[in-house]
Amino acid sequence: MVRLSNLVSCLGLASAVTAAVVDLVPKNFDDVVLKSGKPALVEFFAPWCGHCKNLAPVYEELGQAFAHASDKVTVGKVDADEHRDLGRKFGVQGFPTLKWFDGKSDEPEDYKGGRDLESLSSFISEKTGVKPRGPKKEPSKVEMLNDATFKGAVGGDNDVLVAFTAPWCGHCKNLAPTWEALANDFVLEPNVVIAKVDADAENGKATAREQGVSGYPTIKFFPKGSTESVPYEGARSEQAFIDFLNEKTGTHRTVGGGLDTKAGTIASLDELIASTSAADLAAAVKKAATELKDKYAQYYVKVADKLSQNAEYAAKELARLEKILAKGGSAPEKVDDLISRSNILRKFVGEEKEAKDEL
């Protein structure tokens, strides 16, 4: 009977130790955390704590991500409401509290980063050199900012749209997939940044205070060259965010990351095309383009020059580009270029059709 009891006890202990997230109690804490020589990230939680409940699925996923390296690092948790002596021993005053133990001493380091999977995984990897494993996910295009990086991210050459969020906030959770989609929509815009600050994390609270954040999510736009923000007060749909950014930054994105019919076009040159005779168009466009720094100004010059030699050039070239786009398979950057050039060609084709109608 004693042997069976011991066996059950051992099996229970083994189960606790080999689980993705190790359940720590006074009986095994010292052996697993303090004397093992193996570092550990430990969450001190209480079952009734709302923030703890929100963290629970993320923390379980974290344990799974490092389960392959259980001989190198431990992801553990302590019910500090039941085992209050353990909580008091390490100065736990609120829940959840996360602490990093080096496996050699009883003086842990407070974890002050974000409570999302990416932040927690990065912390463990930086400490141990161990990389997380799990279902392959496309890396997020949202730039995570904190107290150390925020000031360097705004006020420079980029337009920055920032969401100040908290992991326990229901509205923030609803916003998250839209925010990810928005970041993907603008991934090819080198000077537009979609960012996020975990305002509930220790390394994000100071920035949130400085920015006057009092509720979540709070969304602010920082124009390039300015550290003064513009509050975003519109709808929280992907389309609404895209419309806002297109207006503020001069981009032409659509839902899904494509380009609209104005992308690549230059209003002043379009007006010139509409008001200049075919005979004078090439010279007029070339002269006007010399004063422009726009990426596609010289493409206008090229098309106008080609048209002066072949009146069907724009129509034929447009048909060729549309065929390439319809076929698919081009790199995203190439698709952007094809759409922009097609939009420009349509300006010339429209003028050609009007000229033929007059004849």
Swiss-Prot record:
Location(s), subcellular: Endoplasmic reticulum lumen
Motif (Prevents secretion from ER): 356-359
EC number annotated for this UniProt entry: 5.3.4.1
Gene that specifies this protein: tigA
UniProt family annotation: Belongs to the protein disulfide isomerase family.
GO CC, alphabetical: endoplasmic reticulum lumen
Keywords: Disulfide bond, Endoplasmic reticulum, Isomerase, Redox-active center, Repeat, Signal, Stress response
Ranges where the Thioredoxin domain occurs: 20-129, 131-250
Pfam families, per database record: ERp29 (PF07749), Thioredoxin (PF00085)
GO biological process: protein folding
Keyword hit for Disulfide bond: yes
Active site feature: C49 (nucleophile), C52 (nucleophile), C169 (nucleophile), C172 (nucleophile)
Gene3D superfamilies from the UniProt entry: Endoplasmic reticulum resident protein 29, C-terminal domain, Glutaredoxin
Site (Contributes to redox potential value) location in chain: G50, H51, G170, H171
Protein name, per record: Protein disulfide-isomerase tigA
Residues at the site labelled Lowers pKa of C-terminal Cys of second active site: R236
Organism of this sequence: Aspergillus niger
Signal peptide: 1-19
Keyword Disulfide bond among UniProt keywords: yes
EC class: isomerase
